[in-house]
Amino acid sequence: MKIRIGHGFDVHKFGEARPLILCGVEVPYETGLVAHSDGDVVLHAISDAILGAMALGDIGKHFPDTDAAYKGADSRVLLRHCYALARAKGFELGNLDVTIIAQAPKMAPHIEDMRQVLAADLNADIADINVKATTTEKLGFTGRKEGIAVEAVVLLSRQ
């Protein structure tokens, strides 16, 4: 069995007059995230983790923000594309662990919906998908409610 581990990290600042979308789930909040795509910072970190595990670069390489084709892009489509690249090489998801770092909004009411979306998009058992949230105790840009940061770790395996 061959195993690969990938780590992804992404940050977006608040400021767009659009819905806040995290893991493909609309989270009620006063503002959305600034981004070329739909701004789903969680799916961007997960996509980077998958691409990293496969040594395929990052989402900026695959979906450049200089390409108008990706303006407002649905990050779920981007995630599924990244996972399809791994599957094409015979790899399947072992597990996914995500940490959302944000002072606001509160994530707890939305975590299970996020896990369901991820399990569906990655064709995985929900038991293999973990999403958790934390704050920085009001320190730094996330603590000042200026944006959201996300870390994602993925394990992929091939029999």
Curated annotation (Swiss-Prot):
Record's keyword annotation contains Metal-binding: yes
Gene3D superfamilies: 2-C-methyl-D-erythritol 2,4-cyclodiphosphate synthase (3.30.1330.50)
GO biological process, one term: isopentenyl diphosphate biosynthetic process, methylerythritol 4-phosphate pathway
Cofactor note: Binds 1 divalent metal cation per subunit.
Keywords for this protein: Isoprene biosynthesis, Lyase, Metal-binding
Residues flagged as site, Transition state stabilizer: H36, T135
GO molecular function, a single term: metal ion binding
Enzyme class label: lyase
Involved pathway(s): Isoprenoid biosynthesis; isopentenyl diphosphate biosynthesis via DXP pathway; isopentenyl diphosphate from 1-deoxy-D-xylulose 5-phosphate: step 4/6
Coiled coil segments of this chain: none
NCBIfam families: ispF (TIGR00151)
Function: Involved in the biosynthesis of isopentenyl diphosphate (IPP) and dimethylallyl diphosphate (DMAPP), two major building blocks of isoprenoid compounds. Catalyzes the conversion of 4-diphosphocytidyl-2-C-methyl-D-erythritol 2-phosphate (CDP-ME2P) to 2-C-methyl-D-erythritol 2,4-cyclodiphosphate (ME-CPP) with a corresponding release of cytidine 5-monophosphate (CMP).
HAMAP family linked: IspF
Family per similarity comment: Belongs to the IspF family.
Protein name listed in UniProt: 2-C-methyl-D-erythritol 2,4-cyclodiphosphate synthase
Species, as recorded: Shewanella sp. (strain ANA-3)
Lineage summary: Bacteria, Pseudomonadati, Pseudomonadota, Gammaproteobacteria, Alteromonadales
